[in-house]
Amino acid sequence: MSDTRIDFLYLNEKDMIDAGVLDAGHCVETMEEVLCLLAKGDVLMGGKNRREHGIQLIFPKESEIPGFPLEDSRDRRFMSMPAYLGGRFHLAGEKFYGSNGRNVRKGLPRSILMATLNNVETGQPLAYMSANLLSAMRTGAVPGVVAKHLSVKNPKVLTLLGPGVVNKTCLMAYMSQFNSIDTIKIKGSSAASATAKEMERFIKEKYPQVSH
């Protein structure tokens, strides 16, 4: 009888950090490799055209069914985003997230993301992972790749438009590529905002060598 056990890694957010998800330099290297595979066409996304971003669960605005979920708050949705990545990876995977604007009142992120990796031949799950940090680092790594190839040589000044979470991971990606940066400038709506203060704290803690 064949072995039918299905074993996979479960990685919570701490596990992901321990595994190196916050290693911005490695994220930039990986995304550079992924973009090369994309350019070669060694990828698949959803749909017949193989380029669908994903499929979204859309809630109705009203329902006669008691307790039925409704589109009654900002950004309320579920989204499934399957893909195949070739090259040395040769894996199928999916990012799945649920989002609800009311989450903030509960002390939760607006969107909560998970990622699954599967054997592309058998469909066996290989890993089920917390993906909020993973997705954020991926987002920041892409402009990191662009800056790596298109920036002036040995840049001294980095300017960020906005102090939010995405620009925090962009900052990490840029700093992983350029140890010449000694000044960080940020343009935001208010220097007194919570996000601006958090960015200031982050820069002082992680990059004490720069002025801002």
Report the location of each language-model feature.
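Short, surface-exposed alpha-helical segments at coil->helix boundaries
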Residues: 112, 168, 193-197
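Structural signal for hydrophobic packing residues in well-ordered secondary-structure cores
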Residues: 35-42, 147, 151, 178, ...
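NAD(P)-binding Rossmann-fold cofactor-contacting core
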Residues: 177-207
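N-terminal ligand-binding/catalytic initiation module
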Residues: 1-138, 142-144, 154
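Short acidic-hydrophobic, aromatic-tinged amphipathic segments that line or gate anion-handling sites
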Residues: 211-212
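Alpha-helical scaffold segments in soluble metabolic enzymes
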Residues: 30-33, 142-149, 169, 173, ...
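Short, intrinsically disordered/low-complexity patches at protein termini
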Residues: 117, 149-151, 191-193
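Glycine-rich adenosine-cofactor-binding loop
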Residues: 143, 154-178, 187-191
